[in-house]
From Swiss-Prot:
Belongs to the universal ribosomal protein uL29 family. SUPFAM superfamilies: Ribosomal protein L29 (L29p). This is Large ribosomal subunit protein uL29. InterPro entries: Ribosomal_protein_uL29, Ribosomal_uL29, Ribosomal_uL29_sf. The lineage of its organism: Bacteria, Bacillati, Cyanobacteriota, Cyanophyceae, Synechococcales. It comes from Parasynechococcus marenigrum (strain WH8102). The keyword Protein biosynthesis does not apply.
Length: 69
């Protein structure tokens, strides 16, 4: 899964961003569960999911701040 750049993330709608954030949070939970039960094969996936989640949450908070102003 290639990481999207900031321009690609900013082109998404608010609902798409929210859906992706929720999906990534679920995936991160599942990865933690798999790691705890020693079933996780791809440990690098943690980093990928966290980075993508941070990008989406940053864009979401930027939009909320600009809407509040």
């Amino acid at each position: 899964m290639a990481r999207p750049n900031a321009a690609e993330v900013r082109q998404l709608s608010d609902t798409d961003i929210t859906e992706q954030i929720n999906g990534l949070r679920r995936e991160l939970f599942q990865l933690r569960f798999q790691q705890a039960t020693r079933q996780l094969a791809n440990t690098h996936r943690f980093k990928e999911v966290r980075i993508k989640l941070a990008q989406l949450m940053t864009v979401q908070s930027e939009r909320q701040r600009s809407a509040a102003s």
